[in-house]
């Protein structure tokens, strides 16, 4: 049973392959997520907690995640919302409640090179003093 924790930084998850590009992280495997070159198969879960906002070209990464997941596998995403998105100078993109529909079969998404066709299982906004977070669960 393969489970991936993308952009783990110092947040290791036991039982997952913890992935990061930084040698200062607590990663088990080192990948630059900008290159979307991971070759795992039959992945059951992918956790992407506060990493997608750091990715300049997210389309190849989302396509790669979809490709790696087994049928019924899930991707758990958490991204900052509202003012919190631009508080960190390393954030390069923002997300809204509509952002992930392009990876869920939204019309014309293939024009942008999107091959992922996730099913959106849930989406939840959780307010906090930093502006809040958007939690999304996608399934292959």
Regions found by a protein language model. Name each.
Residues 56-66, 70, 74-140:
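S-adenosyl-L-methionine-dependent methyltransferase catalytic module, highlighting the catalytic core
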Residues 1-83:
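Conserved SAM-binding loop
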């Amino acid at each position: 049973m393969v489970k991936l924790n993308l952009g783990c930084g110092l947040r290791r998850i036991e039982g997952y392959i913890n992935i990061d590009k930084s040698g200062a992280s607590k990663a088990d495997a080192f990948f630059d997520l900008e290159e979307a070159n991971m070759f795992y198969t039959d992945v059951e879960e992918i956790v992407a907690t506060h990493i997608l906002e750091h990715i300049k070209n997210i389309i190849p990464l989302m396509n790669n995640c979809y490709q790696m997941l087994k049928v019924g596998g899930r991707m758990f995403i958490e991204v900052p919302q509202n003012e919190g998105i631009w508080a960190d100078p390393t954030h390069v993109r923002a997300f809204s409640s509509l952002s992930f529909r392009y990876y869920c079969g939204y019309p014309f998404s293939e024009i942008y090179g999107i091959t992922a066709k996730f099913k959106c299982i849930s989406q939840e906004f959780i307010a906090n003093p930093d502006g809040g977070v958007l939690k999304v669960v996608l399934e292959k």
